[in-house]
Amino acid sequence: MERNRDRRERDNQPKEFVEKLIKLNAVSKTVKGGRRRSFSALVVVGDQKGRVGYGMGKANDVSYAIRKATETAKKNLITVNVKDSTIPHEVMGNFKSACVLLKPASAGTGVIAGGAVRAVCDAVGIKDILSKSLGSKNTINTVKATLDGLENLFSAKKLSEDRGKSLKDIWG
């Protein structure tokens, strides 16, 4: 009885992070007795306030694979500079042969992005963005390229300090 109460209390608490399952892959290994099935999961987590991370997990059970991936993602969080509901400037993210072009969009445009890029943008908290995936369509590499692009964003404050200008001169 005590354990069930603890579980209910834990489930009723508001979650700190939004978890998005991007890819679940069932793989099988042939052994002497037949085929052994295992699962691989790719998960993106974010707080919708500018922090995001991704993780991969492998296990013999789907739920364990997702749990492992979520824990790994929470350990690999990065902070992204978000201006209002979009990104401050255009950026290109690369990982291996996957390239992702991210462009800021005016308010009300929405997230114009494909599967993996959309999940990352939702987890970060970006509401308006335009994107184009170029090169490889591999899901894992696309997620890594998207995060590379988001990591390379300049903050308005840092840009104004580097150029020796005020914030109003740069962003208008």
What are these regions (language model features)?
Residues 1-172:
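Ribosome-associated RNA-binding proteins
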